Amino acid sequence: MLKKIVILFTFLSTISFSTEIMFQKIYSNTLRFEGKTYIKNNIEESKYGISKAYSKDVKNLTEKKAFDIAYNKIYKAHNIDKIENEKVRMFVFDWIYNSAPRGAIKRIQKLIDVKITGNMNIETITAINDFSDTDLLIHLLKETRLNYLKTLKHYEKYKNGWQYRIANVV
């Protein structure tokens, strides 16, 4: 019996470890665009792309704490880990990380024609995973994200960075 428990624990630990390794790749990709410095301007205050919505003391945020927030409060909390295709998972994480999560999710839900709730629920995940042409889905996600950004009043100021990010995140 003890041997079965040890085997089960080892198996579950491996799954958790593998999930974190996959996430590390996704997170590192997003940090290419976010940077690691503290930023305070008339729009926001952030560090590692983490805003005050996730951490009250953004200025003193450590890289480890930023990683934990990104993993637990964004990646896992919004079920991004349930997206099967790595490139789609990477793009969706970056979008949600860089935007108001509910707004990004609503735009994704509208695009894939599921009930718009603002929550990355099983219906949304299933529709994403069942999308037959991954390249087309990524193209449509990029187009939808860029079209949304064009509606923002700060678009002209940040458009070059935003366009570059969307074109190169996956």
Q: What positions do the PLM features span?
A:
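Cell-wall polysaccharide-cleaving catalytic domain and substrate-binding groove, primarily
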Residues: S16-V170
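Classical Sec-dependent N-terminal signal peptides that target proteins to the secretory pathway
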Residues: M1-S18
